[in-house]
């Protein structure tokens, strides 16, 4: 709401703690990026210099924290104790790390692993291009969505809330936004590679004070 408002919202899924953890890490990435913009000096607030370079860069920051940090072995080693204290059925941080990085096909974009995530974006981008160019009637969107999901991911939504209505973007008028996520993934990978070349492996990082209140 203002130049120093960095509050975030997150997703809480009962019985799915990894989902909530990664969602929070993602939104934290957005927040910390905003905190580092020149707009915080107030001098450049609302000016181009004080704004994000692009939404792809913005998403790269959130995806860096979600996929490069929160899914790292070093983070799992440091944070596992919090889950163990809450009755986590996993025996050690190694199992925690493996579980949070499991690869499986699914319907939900925000729950997708890094391997299949790009396919979710490709489906949305292809469909919205067809919509914008007038080649796809909106009433036919659920059918075409389900068809593409079966073709590319081998899964079919049982209802539209699992399918073409699962994202808020189109209902908000945010057409053309989805590629920002995929470009953001690529940028976050480049940041990780540069970081590790300069200062060493992310998995060598020692995290402290990672305890739940």
Predicted regions and their residues:
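C-terminal substrate/ligand-recognition segments
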Residues: 173-193
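Post-HExxH zinc-binding segment in Zn-dependent metallohydrolases
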Residues: 51-88
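Active-site-proximal, well-structured secondary-structure segments within enzyme catalytic domains
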Residues: 1-11
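Active-site recognition of the HExxH zinc-binding catalytic motif
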Residues: 22-35, 62
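Short pre-active-site segment immediately N-terminal to the catalytic Zn-binding motif
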Residues: 10-22
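Long, amphipathic alpha-helical stalk/connector segments used for oligomerization, subunit docking
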Residues: 75-168, 172
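Post-HEXXH active-site segment of zinc metalloproteases
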Residues: 34-60
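Conserved small/polar residues in nucleotide/adenosyl-binding loops
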Residues: 208-213
């Amino acid at each position: 709401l203002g130049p120093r408002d960095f509050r975030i919202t997150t997703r809480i899924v009962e019985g799915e703690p990894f989902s909530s953890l990664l969602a929070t890490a993602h939104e934290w990435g957005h927040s910390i990026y905003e905190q580092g913009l020149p707009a915080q000096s107030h001098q450049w607030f609302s000016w181009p210099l004080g704004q994000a370079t692009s939404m792809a860069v913005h998403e790269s920051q959130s995806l860096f924290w979600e996929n490069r940090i929160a899914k790292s072995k070093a983070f799992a080693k440091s944070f596992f104790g919090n889950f163990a204290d809450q009755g986590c059925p996993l025996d050690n941080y190694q199992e925690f790390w493996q579980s949070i990085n499991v690869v499986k096909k699914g319907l939900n974009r925000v729950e997708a692993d890094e391997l299949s995530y790009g396919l979710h974006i490709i489906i949305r981008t292809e469909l919205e291009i067809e919509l914008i160019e007038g080649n796809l009637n909106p009433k036919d969107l659920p059918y075409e969505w389900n068809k593409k999901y079966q073709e590319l991911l081998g899964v079919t939504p049982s209802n539209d809330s699992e399918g073409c209505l699962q994202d808020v973007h189109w209902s908000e008028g945010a057409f053309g936004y989805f590629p920002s996520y995929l470009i953001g993934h690529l940028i976050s990978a480049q940041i990780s590679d540069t970081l590790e070349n300069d200062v060493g492996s992310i998995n060598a990082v020692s995290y402290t004070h990672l305890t739940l209140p």
